[in-house]
Amino acid sequence: MAYIAVVGSANVAVGAFPFQKLRVREYNPGRVQTSLGGAGRNIAHNLRLLGEEVELFTALGGDGYARAMEESCRKLGIGLNHALRVPDTRTSTYVYFADERGDMTAAVADTAICDQLDPAYFAERLDALNAAALVAADTSLPAESLEYLAKNLTVPLFVDPVSIEKSEKLTELLPLIHTLKPNRPEAELLSGIPVVDRNSARRAARRLIDLGVKQVFLSLGREGFLAAAEDETVWEPAPEAEVVKTTGAGDALMAALTWAYLRGENLSRMAALGASAAAITIECEKTINPELSAEAVLRRAH
């Protein structure tokens, strides 16, 4: 089985969940949860749950967090054969605050180690990247590294923009991206079209297709998402779900899209399977639902 190369961040996520409505500048009783995360690592974890072989191209520090990350990846079967070790640097760390519904309200990320993932790192590993079935990347990499990948990969490149700020790295690379998974503000920045409803989401997605992206999956959160390709546009409503927490849904969606693409699914079916994976994820208090599987996703999809 050909592996999927996942390129991006691997960090420790510390989440704070208030029991009631979050009060700014006040003490909030709640629960604090520490977990291994990072968009790249989470996508890789979800892909393993879906039964795919995965190699994670990331940077790890020389601290206890890095050792915990390595042990977790070993147990999950996520390959770290091409990961960069930086002994005197902190492993990437991400702290976020959720509201009473579990939705993230704000976050602070210490991701300086990701700057070590420079073009030279990828040039040394280009053969391994191009030996993959496809490459799924987040935008925690330096802009010049994303450009290097986009211009030198010979396999499809799937990209999760991750944030508005990091989305700016993609503005000149859109014609080189196979599949893009932006949320509303990321799509607005990249397309130049305000997304206020389903019709404007369609226009933004079509604009991204016109700019050269082959497939766009534009997430509108709890409403669902819009999928677009050159000759097709599909609206995929969010499935019924008992929402526990929404953090991690985008990573599950990204993983399911890559998995579905490699299954040979069409745009509409990719959208349905992606929505199914996201729904399964938000029904668990963990960022990654251990109950996610190919069978569960197929069973849940319409």
Segments from the language model and where they lie:
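Residues that scaffold the ATP/ADP-binding catalytic core of kinase and kinase-like folds
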Residues: 15, 107, 190-192, 228, ...
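Conserved phosphate-binding/catalytic region of the ribokinase-like
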Residues: 1-6, 167, 198-302
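Short, conserved phosphate/pyrophosphate- and ester-handling motifs at nucleotide-, phospho-/glycolipid
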Residues: 47, 183, 250
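Glycine-rich phosphate/adenosyl-contacting loop at the front of the ribokinase-like
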Residues: 1-59, 64-78, 242-244
